[in-house]
Amino acid sequence: MSLEPFIDSKPFTFGVELEMQIVNTHDYDLTKAGSDLLRLIKDEKIPGNITPEITESMIELSTGICTTHEQAVTDLRKIRDTLVSAADHLNVGLCGGGTHAFQQWSERQIVDTPRFQYLSELYGYLAKQFTVFGQHVHIGCPDPNSALYLLHSMSRFIPHFIALSASSPFVQGVDTGFHSARLNSVFAFPLSGRAPFVLTWDSFEEYFSKMVHTGVVNSMKDFYWDIRPKPGFGTIEVRVMDTPLSVDRAAAIACYIQTLARHLLLDKPIAPQEDDYLVYTFNRFEACRFGLAGTCINPQTGERKTISEDILETLDLIAPHAEALGSGNALAEIGAIARGQVNDATWLRGVVEREKSLHEAVRQQCLQWRA
């Protein structure tokens, strides 16, 4: 199978995908209601899509093509409200969060589609353990070489995206000590991690052809990279974020990525090189484990900062691009998160400390999602 052509798209347009938890309203464990939700909303007119995910306890919502923060917030709220109304009809709850706090992976049911059943057969128990919930952001790119440049220059900021969105401190009833434990489930897959260091589309097509020839992959969907090109959309897809607890937070993070992309493609402040990845795994671990208080090493200068400090310096740097895109409110929210060092994982731990109940924490996650 050959790689599909890269469809040039309007630069700095973006789309948001959110994988959602479906819970019962008795003890707030995950419940099997994905197919029922889809049946209820199939005729609803929404500014995007709602699709199944790998298990019946998940569902994915996605916006259409957005250009501004205001549009993203408006569209996400409309889709959320449609889903919440359907969930209320079924007496189930919806919430964000990168992991469910106490679900048991062995109880999950794989959705009956050819691809999901294939993944279940291929990956065994990992497929059910993949009942984790992420935010993906697509960024429009004018041509394929620009997409690869943006992919590799954007990798420098992966710790920012992880720490800002982190909302998965609990797994199977245990505080993991991580801010984003979700990504530990992703790392178990053999084709996860970072994309290969190639900067031209011809080289990428050659790499893809070799991988297809080995029989390891059939399409781009088989790569679980932190950032991957999406040729059919004309985008790169940033995939490291936990699903935030609110659509407003998700929109703010998406617009931070959009604004960074404009800075990187127009100003070209980074000349990507293979050695940039020497600290990549360390930086990613620090963000997952310690969140905004983690250490971030600049791969080109070797300078160490906390991730929150690095975010605040980056916000100053990209301020002119925020003004051009109309994303000032989004970046103000990002700045507030970084200064306060309070992401959703911190909030969840606070709820559990006060209430002494993971069930109550999930209930409050549902309230956050509706707000």
UniProtKB/Swiss-Prot annotation:
Keyword Nucleotide-binding: yes
Similarity section: Belongs to the glutamate--cysteine ligase type 2 family. YbdK subfamily.
NCBIfam families: gshA_cyan_rel, PRK13516.1
E.C. designation(s): 6.3.2.2
Biological process (GO), any one: modified amino acid biosynthetic process
Protein name stated in the entry: Putative glutamate--cysteine ligase 2
Job of this protein: ATP-dependent carboxylate-amine ligase which exhibits weak glutamate--cysteine ligase activity.
Keywords: ATP-binding, Ligase, Nucleotide-binding
InterPro entries, A to Z: GCL_type2/YbdK_subfam, GCS2, Gln_synth/guanido_kin_cat_dom, YbdK
Lineage, broadest ranks: Bacteria, Pseudomonadati, Pseudomonadota, Betaproteobacteria, Burkholderiales
Catalytic activity: L-cysteine + L-glutamate + ATP = gamma-L-glutamyl-L-cysteine + ADP + phosphate + H(+)
Species of the source: Paraburkholderia phytofirmans (strain DSM 17436 / LMG 22146 / PsJN) (Burkholderia phytofirmans)
GO molecular function, one term: glutamate-cysteine ligase activity
Enzyme class, spelled out: ligase
Keyword flag rRNA-binding: no
